[in-house]
C-alpha cells in the first residue's frame, strides 16, 4: 500500500508541476518540445532494438542486467506472440515491452496530426512497426481506434475510413477463401493472416495470458463485492491476490488499469474518475475544432486521440499507476485546456 501511494504521489506531483509550469503559451510550447524530444529518442532506441542486437543496459534482455541488481526476465510473463521464438522485443526506457507500446501509442497522435506530410508518414510507420514488434493486442487495438478517430473526427474523412475497413475486411475474407489453396506459397500467406486474426481476437492465448488475466479480474471483482462496492483501498488488490497465492503462481498485479481503479477505489470513486476522464477528453475534442489558434488546436487534437487510444491500451500493462507517461498526458491535457480557456477569455475581454 505504501509503495502504491508513493507512485500516486509522484504521478500527481508530475501532473501538477506540468500544469503549474505551463502558465503561458510559450512555456507550454517549451514543455511539449522537451517531452517530445525525450520520447523521440526513445522511439529511435526502440527501432534499434527491434532490428538490431542493441539493448539499453536496463533492458531485461541486456547482458549488463546483472550489474543493476536484476535477474533476467521470464519472457512468458509477457502477453506476446513471440514468446516461443528467439526474438526479443524492444523495451526502450521501460522494463516491459507492453509499457513501451503504450508510450508509443500516446505519441502516435502527435505524428498523425502533424501538418508536415513526411513527419506524419514516417512517424506513423515507425510507431506502428514498434507496436507490431511489441505484439500487444490491447495496444494494437488502441492504434486502430486512434486512426479511426483521426480519420472520422479530426479529418472527417468518413468515406476514406469506410474504404479502408472494406479493404481490410475484404483482405481477411479473401485470405480465408485461399486457406485451402493447393499453391503452398498462397496457402502459407493465407494461414498466416488467419493466425493473426485469431491472435488479435484472443482465440490464440499465448502463454495462457488471457486466462490468467481473466482470473485476476475475477478475483478483484470478488473482493469488490465483499467490500460492498466500497473498494479495497489503494494498492489493496495486490495483497488480495497474494493471499490467494498469485495467479499462475506469480501474478499479483491486476493487469487491467480500469478494473484496478474499480476494485481499489470502489464504485463511487471509479465513477468520479471515469466522469473526469470523459470531461477532459470532451474538452480536448472541442479544442480540436477550434481553428483560431493552430498550435493549441494541434495540441488538443493530438491529446484527444491519445486519451482515446489510452483506454484500451492501458489494459496491456500490469498497472499504469506508476506509468509516468500517463501522468504527463494528464498534466499536458489540463494545461492545454487552461491555455485554451485563457485565449478564449482574452478574446472576449478585448
State the predicted function of each range.
Residues 6, 10, 23, 36-39, ...:
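Transmembrane alpha-helices of multi-pass, membrane-embedded glycan-processing enzymes
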Residues 159, 279, 301-350:
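Transmembrane alpha-helices of multi-pass inner-membrane enzymes
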Residues 1-23, 29-40, 326-350:
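Membrane-anchoring hydrophobic segments
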Residues 44, 48-54, 134, 154-204, ...:
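A membrane-periplasm/extracellular boundary helix in multi-pass inner-membrane enzymes
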Residues 117-120, 144-152, 242, 264-309:
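Hydrophobic transmembrane alpha-helices and their immediate junctions
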Residues 198-265, 286-291:
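Long extracytoplasmic/lumenal interhelical loops at the membrane interface
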Residues 9-17, 29-153, 165, 308-311:
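Alpha-helical transmembrane segments of multi-pass inner-membrane proteins
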Residues 17-27, 111-117, 148-157, 281-289, ...:
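Structural signal for the C-terminal ends of transmembrane alpha-helices
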Amino acid at each position: 500500500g505504501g509503495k502504491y501511494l508513493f507512485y500516486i504521489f509522484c504521478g500527481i506531483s508530475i501532473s501538477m508541476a506540468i500544469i503549474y509550469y505551463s502558465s503561458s503559451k510559450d512555456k507550454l510550447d517549451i514543455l511539449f518540445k522537451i517531452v517530445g524530444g525525450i520520447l523521440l529518442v526513445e522511439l529511435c532506441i526502440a527501432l534499434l532494438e527491434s532490428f538490431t542486437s542493441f539493448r539499453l543496459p536496463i533492458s531485461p534482455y541486456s547482458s549488463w542486467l546483472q550489474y543493476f541488481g536484476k535477474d533476467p526476465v521470464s519472457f512468458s510473463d509477457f502477453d506476446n506472440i513471440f514468446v516461443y521464438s528467439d526474438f526479443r522485443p524492444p523495451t526502450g526506457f521501460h522494463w516491459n515491452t507492453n509499457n513501451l507500446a503504450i508510450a508509443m501509442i500516446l505519441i502516435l497522435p502527435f505524428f498523425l496530426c502533424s501538418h508536415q506530410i513526411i513527419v506524419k508518414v514516417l512517424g506513423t510507420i515507425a510507431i506502428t512497426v514498434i507496436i507490431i514488434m511489441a505484439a500487444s493486442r490491447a495496444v494494437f487495438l488502441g492504434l486502430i481506434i486512434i486512426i479511426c478517430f483521426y480519420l472520422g473526427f479530426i479529418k472527417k474523412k468518413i468515406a476514406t475510413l469506410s474504404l479502408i475497413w472494406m479493404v481490410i475486411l475484404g483482405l481477411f475474407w479473401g485470405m480465408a477463401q485461399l486457406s485451402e489453396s493447393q499453391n503452398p506459397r498462397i496457402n502459407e500467406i493465407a494461414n498466416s493472416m488467419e493466425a493473426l486474426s485469431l491472435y488479435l481476437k484472443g482465440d490464440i492465448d499465448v502463454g495462457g495470458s488471457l486466462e490468467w488475466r481473466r482470473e485476476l479480474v475475477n478475483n478483484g471483482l470478488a473482493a469488490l463485492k465483499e467490500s460492498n462496492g466500497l473498494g479495497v483501498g489503494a494498492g489493496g488488490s495486490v495483497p488480495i491476490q497474494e493471499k490467494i497465492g498469485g495467479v499462475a503462481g506469480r501474478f499479483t498485479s491486476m493487469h487491467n488499469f480500469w478494473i484496478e481503479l474499480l476494485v481499489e477505489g470502489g464504485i463511487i470513486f471509479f465513477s468520479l474518475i471515469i466522469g473526469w476522464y470523459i470531461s477532459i477528453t470532451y474538452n480536448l475534442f472541442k479544442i480540436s475544432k477550434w481553428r483560431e489558434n493552430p498550435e493549441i488546436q494541434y495540441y488538443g487534437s493530438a491529446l484527444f486521440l491519445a486519451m482515446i487510444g489510452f483506454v484500451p491500451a492501458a489494459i496491456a500493462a500490469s498497472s499504469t499507476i506508476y506509468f509516468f507517461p500517463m501522468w504527463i498526458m494528464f498534466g499536458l491535457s489540463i494545461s492545454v485546456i487552461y491555455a485554451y480557456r485563457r485565449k478564449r477569455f482574452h478574446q472576449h475581454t478585448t
